Swiss-Prot record:
Keywords: ATP synthesis, Cell inner membrane, Cell membrane, CF(1), Hydrogen ion transport, Ion transport, Membrane, Transport. It comes from Burkholderia multivorans (strain ATCC 17616 / 249). F-type ATPases have 2 components, CF(1) - the catalytic core - and CF(0) - the membrane proton channel. CF(1) has five subunits: alpha(3), beta(3), gamma(1), delta(1), epsilon(1). CF(0) has three main subunits: a, b and c. It is found in: Cell inner membrane. The lineage of its organism: Bacteria, Pseudomonadati, Pseudomonadota, Betaproteobacteria, Burkholderiales. InterPro entries: ATP_synth_F1_ATPase_gsu, ATP_synth_F1_gsu, ATP_synth_F1_gsu_CS. GO terms for cellular component: plasma membrane; proton-transporting ATP synthase complex. The keyword Cell inner membrane applies. This is ATP synthase gamma chain. It is a peripheral membrane protein. Produces ATP from ADP in the presence of a proton gradient across the membrane. The gamma chain is believed to be important in regulating ATPase activity and the flow of protons through the CF(0) complex. Pfam families: ATP-synt. GO terms for molecular function: ATP binding; proton-transporting ATP synthase activity, rotational mechanism. One of its GO terms (biological process) is proton motive force-driven plasma membrane ATP synthesis. The gene is atpG.
Length: 291
């Protein structure tokens, strides 16, 4: 009977765990829809800023913004690492962290040091354990990304690049493909090249000019900063949509596994109970026969 009591305890424990994972699955599904809506809402703005930046960068060849000039003499590269603040989202963070480690090694082989900005608690913890130099950080963003919370940390990298202290700035995050698929990517944020201004189908942007007020340099300077900020915001929005999707899938898998374990434990319990009843009946029959 002690064995049966232990099995009942295990069944109860797994049932309680399944209730938790089922609730988390439902919460993640709700948050996922909102995160996807925010991500899709941010895309038109990012696309429009991309188009304007393309026109302006091609229309003013006499002026080159610092973001469009390679700092070939710099021996340090920057990376902005976007991860989640919470876990229980499958291999989402593991994949982007693994890709980041590979990028770190590639840069070090080229004689480049790496200085990082962490967006998300998981990435910050990883960078500290990895021994990387963390220039700035943003954690506890919540379920809704706000640009004003990101600007300070991102500006640290932008300023260093403008001063010629960084050879390049990379952006590592998880791109949302669909509910079942997310992809860890590392993109070069700076220096900007013509590839940054191509359309999604790979077609280069057309060249035509604007009338600038007060002058072209002032407008280009402001716009390219906004352009980079838009890229970072879009990356964070994509990462949040990926997080909720991955968490929903992970919790669904956990709930399904818990259901399977409960069924298996219930079968073991029934067999044990049947064996105990059979044993008791045998003892009763044997005792009656002896009498």
């Amino acid at each position: 009977m002690a064995g049966m009591k232990e099995i009942r305890g295990k069944i109860k424990s797994v049932q309680n765990t399944r209730k938790i994972t089922k609730a988390m699955e439902m919460v993640a599904a709700s948050k996922m829809r909102r995160a996807q809506e925010r991500m899709r809402a941010a895309r038109p703005y990012a696309d429009k800023v991309r188009a304007i930046a393309a026109h302006m960068s091609r229309a003013n060849p006499e002026y080159r913004h610092p973001f469009m000039v390679a700092n070939e003499g710099a021996k340090t590269a920057g990376i902005i690492l976007v991860t989640t603040d919470k876990g229980l989202c499958g291999g989402l963070n593991t994949n982007v962290l693994r890709a980041s480690v590979q990028k770190f090694k590639e840069l070090e082989e080229k004689g480049q040091k790496v200085e990082a900005t962490a967006i998300g608690g998981k990435g910050l913890g990883f960078l500290n354990r990895f021994g990387a130099k963390v220039l700035s950080q943003v954690v506890h963003l919540g379920d809704t990304p706000h640009l004003d919370k990101l600007i300070g940390a991102v500006k640290t990298q932008l300023d260093l690049y403008s001063e010629g202290k960084l050879s390049a700035v990379y952006l590592a995050y998880t791109r949302f493909i669909n509910t079942m698929k997310q992809e860890a990517v590392i993109e070069q944020l700076l220096p900007l090249s013509s590839e940054h201004f191509e359309a999604d189908d790979g077609t280069p942007a057309t060249s035509w000019d604007y009338i600038y007020e007060p002058d072209a340099q002032a407008v280009v300077d402001e716009l390219l900063v906004r352009y980079v900020e838009a890229l970072v915001y879009q990356a964070v929005a994509e990462n949040m949509a990926s997080e909720q999707s991955a968490r929903m899938v992970a919790m669904k898998a956990a709930s399904d596994n818990a259901k399977t374990v409960i069924s298996e434990l219930q079968l073991v319990y029934n067999k044990s109970r049947q064996a105990a009843i059979t044993k008791e009946l045998s003892e009763i029959v044997g005792g009656a026969a002896a009498v």
